Amino acid sequence: MTIRPARAHDFPGFLGLAAQVEQWFGPMVEVPGFHDAVREHIDGRDGHAALVAPSSSGPGLLGGMLFGTRGPTYHVHWLVVSGRARGTGVGRALVEEAVRRWVRYPGEIEVVTFGPDHPGADVSGARVFYERLGFAPAEAAAPGPEGGSRQVFRRTVDRRQGIG
């Protein structure tokens, strides 16, 4: 599997991934602010970066990640794995590559994901995914745009280390 920095031509792939998860996260594909955020991360502006797992069997992306590269608190801003690639290690590989490229210790990595009562929490597997990567549930976060609960997950980085 290849993980690489996103390029401008990957933008439609990010929209394709977003379309697969709008039922959990709310509208993104038609939202100009989402488009701007993806482009800002692809361009690597202001402490932002984007990684992708391109499909080897055709167009589109197996996964994509938007990441905040400024420490000591780093942020997974957005991470989606295509439905056809979930459970195959794509998400883990994206996080591992972000850690390898940008995370320095001491520090921490934060992500906001579904709260425990959100309908997407079990179906998506997001909470379990982050826990398996060494993140721990922390404080509640503001509700998502669709009104569902959110929670911060945090992982302390106390030395140069890989994921789980």
What are the residue ranges of the model-derived segments?
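Glyoxalase I/VOC metalloenzyme domain signal
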Residues: 157-164
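Conserved GNAT acetyl-CoA-binding A-motif
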Residues: 102-121
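Conserved active-site alpha-helix within GNAT-family acetyltransferase domains
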Residues: 92, 116-139
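Conserved G/P- and acidic residue-centered "switch" motifs that form tight phosphate/ATP-binding loops
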Residues: 89
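Solvent-exposed beta-strand sheet faces enriched in polar/charged residues
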Residues: 68, 112, 138-141
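Short acidic/glycine-enriched loop/turn segments that link adjacent beta-strands
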Residues: 72, 144-149
